[in-house]
Amino acid sequence: GYAVAYETAASAFDAFECAKFQRGSADGEAAAQRVEQYLGCDLMILDDLGTEMITAYSTSALYTLINTRLTRAKATIISTNCSNEELQKKYTPQILSRIEGEYQTLPFVGRDIRQIKKEREA
């Protein structure tokens, strides 16, 4: 079988931060294990990129995640509701270069399924 990890961007970057700053604690060790899973699994699904609070640390964590997985030739799916222009405002040129150069963009069109469900329930 294949090892797959799914995480929202915000939660993944929180795990990176916890692993670094709470090293030695039970929470820090659990976070470090999650980070290793994100870096080493066969397929990582990073959901909702761009919804996290953008900090120097979250940007560093994103770079580490993307670059490490590319170096290890591991598959990664990144979902976002951000346009390319929004991503350019949020992230560094190094991150954007990797995303634009190494990933295939698959735009989704149509209405938001959550809005459709809400309308049906009303």
Language model region names:
Residues Y2-G40, A56:
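Short glycine-rich substrate-engagement loop in P-loop NTPases that contacts/grips substrate
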Residues Y2-A3, G40-M44, R72-I78:
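Loop/turn-to-beta-strand initiation segments
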